């Protein structure tokens, strides 16, 4: 079987959020994958595709793996969106400067969708979030995912008001 050329992992940073969008490793490429995660200070991986590797080595390195698979080319379920936004809010509040890695098979569809949702919830417009991610991850998103993101209405879960009732420009307080 021919080896697929996979895009390099890309870091997406917005306000106080840091994400690493990447493709899935295999057991054969796991050590290199772990090195890459450590280089970016990743403490949590969200795996949104079927498992292609054993998580034992990753967990031994202190990196928590969450399995939230959803169908390739499709938008995430409401439950996955809720879980994702809760994770983002908690991680960046409790571990400032940390990085959350997200991967699907190629890192072009499902993983970028979750990162785009976090950017939108953080105050970025849908079009800007798509362009911002595509500048770093060419080919990200298919037409069904773009339509989902266009219709997505932020719940303002990653924006807060200060004690005076003013919107705080900081994403998470």
From Swiss-Prot:
Mutagenesis or variant effect for residue 104 to S: Abolishes enzymatic activity
UniProt induction comment: Strongly down-regulated upon tetrodotoxin treatment.
Residue ranges of the region described as Interaction with ATF5: 97-132
Broadest EC class assigned to this enzyme: hydrolase
EC number, UniProt record: 3.1.3.48
Residues noted as binding substrate in the record, renumbered to the chain: 110
One GO CC term on file: endoplasmic reticulum
Disulfide bonds: 49-104
Keyword Lipoprotein: yes
Keyword Cell cycle found: yes
Regulation acting on activity, per entry: Inhibited by sodium orthovanadate and pentamidine.
Active-site residue numbers: 72 (proton donor), 104 (phosphocysteine intermediate)
BP term (GO), one: positive regulation of cell migration
PROSITE patterns hit by this protein: TYR_PHOSPHATASE_2, TYR_PHOSPHATASE_DUAL
Positions where Cysteine methyl ester occurs in the chain: 170
Protein's job: Protein tyrosine phosphatase which stimulates progression from G1 into S phase during mitosis. May play a role in the development and maintenance of differentiating epithelial tissues. Enhances cell proliferation, cell motility and invasive activity, and promotes cancer metastasis.
Stated name of the protein: Protein tyrosine phosphatase type IVA 1
Origin organism lineage: Eukaryota, Metazoa, Chordata, Craniata, Vertebrata
Gene from which this protein is expressed: PTP4A1
